[in-house]
Amino acid sequence: MSNLTPREIVSELDKFIIGQSDAKRMVAIAMRNRWRRQQLPPELRDEIAPKNIIMMGPTGVGKTEIARRLAKLAGCPFFKVEATKFTEVGYVGRDVESMVRDLMEIGINLVRKEEMEKVKVKAEKHAEDALLDILLPSSKPKQPGMGFFNPAAPEEQEEQPSADQSSTREKFRKMWREGKLDDREVEIEVSVQGGGVEIMSMPGMEDMGMQVNDMIGKMFPNKKKMRKVKIREAYDILIQQESDKLIDMDNVAELARERVEQGGILFLDEIDKIAGNQEGGGSANVSREGVQRDLLPVVEGCVVNTKYGMVKTDHILFISAGAFSYAKPSDLIPELQGRFPLRVELTSLDKDDFYRILTEPQNALTVQYKALLETENLNIDFSREALEEVALNAQKFNEETENIGARRLYTIMEKILSDLSFEAPDRSGDSIVIDKEYVQKQLQDVTEDRDLSRYIL
């Protein structure tokens, strides 16, 4: 787990997210508290639970991005799910425990990727040897299933080759490393999942269908088949196969479970949509309240059964978010409110924020569009006045229509650059400066016709 200080975490988040300093400080403290907890003796460590957070603010102000960047920064398993996808136990739909199973899958993939990186050098060497075995099969008869490197019988594979064979093998090794054999086709043996029965699950019951399919799949052994591919593709397949042999999946599952339990982050979006309000009524409110009650034990701490073993949720950090346009946090049932003790309100964005979003982040929209058009050898640049005009229009359209936050910049930039994107292949080698007049010209029809702007922007 990352041991960055709160100030360093906020500094890293500032590279991608503009403003929202209160929210950044709160999540930075929450992340630092996880590191602090790991430094405590076990008997006290187990008593300290994470302080879950509710983020309130309109769409497009950075709620999801803050949580996503935080998880990436800390190297933690992170899963985002909309609270509206869940249904009360007993109804058709996803149960709330499915998000813990999804988080565990992400943890497995994260740890497996790290373990594969550790054995990468050894796997590449084994894959290269296996490739040369295919290109230069030995004269001795092969055992069944010996289409490539077999670590179970190294003494048989390492019989003393003749000088000519060694020389030829090294020549082929050199040619392979220089890329001279990339277009050549070879036949390799690959594993094929044993034939099972495909279970078609009902909408909302995909988790059950996947578990049944997985269970049936294990009843059928994997089969081997020969496949003809280019050498470069064969090398990638062999690396994957050799890595799988070198990795202990039981150890991966154990490490992943530990990481999920101690450092996992579950992001519950649209939490306001399951809050009961006075406008609706009847069965709708009852159903929403049922989902909230199902969330209680998971957020408080329980044990969820996954195909990799039991996962405790006691120390998973839950971050929930919602616009709360038609509901308030107090509309959540009191028990759930108590399990999210920290609350922070994210502010709406104005033209100054939009300008900073266009210029400051490492992945700013202007940087992205420049890079895209440079692939066609078309160089574009934006004047300061042009970006100020874009920011002003973003604020204006958000005020006059629906406020969708920074996402408004996507629609405006697409409208401004649509002609250049279409003509880019024909304007290879050109350099264009986009100024204020160009922006005004491209947006003229939608700025003058308010009804049209509702549909276009």
Curated annotation (Swiss-Prot):
SUPFAM superfamilies: P-loop containing nucleoside triphosphate hydrolases. ATP binds at residues 18, 60-65, 269, 335, 407. Keywords: ATP-binding, Chaperone, Cytoplasm, Nucleotide-binding, Stress response. Residues 142-171 are annotated as: Disordered. It is found in: Cytoplasm. The keyword Ribosomal protein does not apply. One of its GO terms (molecular function) is proteasome-activating activity. InterPro entries: AAA+_ATPase, ATP-dep_Clp_protease_ClpX, ATPase_AAA_core, Clp_ATPase_C, HslU, P-loop_NTPase. GO terms for cellular component: HslUV protease complex. PANTHER family: ATP-DEPENDENT CLP PROTEASE ATP-BINDING SUBUNIT CLPX-LIKE, MITOCHONDRIAL-RELATED, ATP-DEPENDENT PROTEASE ATPASE SUBUNIT HSLU. Belongs to the ClpX chaperone family. HslU subfamily. This is ATP-dependent protease ATPase subunit HslU. The lineage of its organism: Bacteria, Pseudomonadati, Thermodesulfobacteriota, Desulfovibrionia, Desulfovibrionales. The gene is hslU.
